[in-house]
Amino acid sequence: LVLGKAFHESKKTFLEIIQPGDTVWVIGGGTGAILPEILKRCGKNGKIIYMEASNKMLEKAKGRVSLDCQSRVEFICSEDFGLPNEGEIDVVITQFLLDVLTDHSINSLFQRVKQKVSPSTSWLFLDFYPVKDKQWLIHLMITSFSLLAKHPRKELPDYDKFFKNWDWGEKKAVSFEKGFYKAKLYRLAPKAIKSETISLK
């Protein structure tokens, strides 16, 4: 594989912040490689909402969940990121998702997430970044995806701009392959959190 072992290991970055009882929303999770690890961390009182646009990918992800854990995972096939009437989400996870979305779809995703989060929600983000010595590989990937899956982009998104515009502050970051892909932990910036007004009279 061109991307190697580090690519697969990167998907485990920051999963340790998931606590027993958490509700975790995985968006664009593909075949579910990280599902067993998330299940272990959120425990029997936790819940996973696993959203994927491809039915084929979703079926493969279901195969990674044992019978005794199936009640703890809700699988949703969706392209518009819409959730049913769930409670607040504790952890949002997007891994190698935003790079395949248009700017409009990215903003739609942030809008959907905003409706389901609280001040304590964490967002675990992982995606490719434009680095000089990997431009050929980025071009190859985007061109290949464009031909095979109608990839809408010609270049990688400005992820940092979107997180900043939607009031998410970066708390931690880990780079892989000299910055070719990065894992980041985000939380809502203080200005985005509605604080209660206390009147002292």
Regions flagged by a language model, labelled:
Residues 107-119:
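A short glycine-rich, Lys/Arg-flanked "PGG" loop and its adjoining helix->strand segment in the class I
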Residues 4-21:
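Conserved alpha-helix/loop element of class I SAM-dependent methyltransferases that forms part
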Residues 43, 101-102, 117-119:
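Helix-to-beta-strand junctions that scaffold the AdoMet/dcAdoMet cofactor pocket
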Residues 25-82:
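Class I SAM-dependent methyltransferase SAM/SAH-binding core
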Residues 126-177:
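C-terminal alpha-helical "lid/dimerization" subdomain adjacent to the S-adenosyl-L-methionine
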Residues 93:
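A conserved beta-strand element that flanks and buttresses the S-adenosyl-L-methionine
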Residues 167, 171-201:
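Core SAM-dependent methyltransferase catalytic element
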Residues 14, 38, 112-113:
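Class I S-adenosylmethionine-dependent transferase superfamily signal
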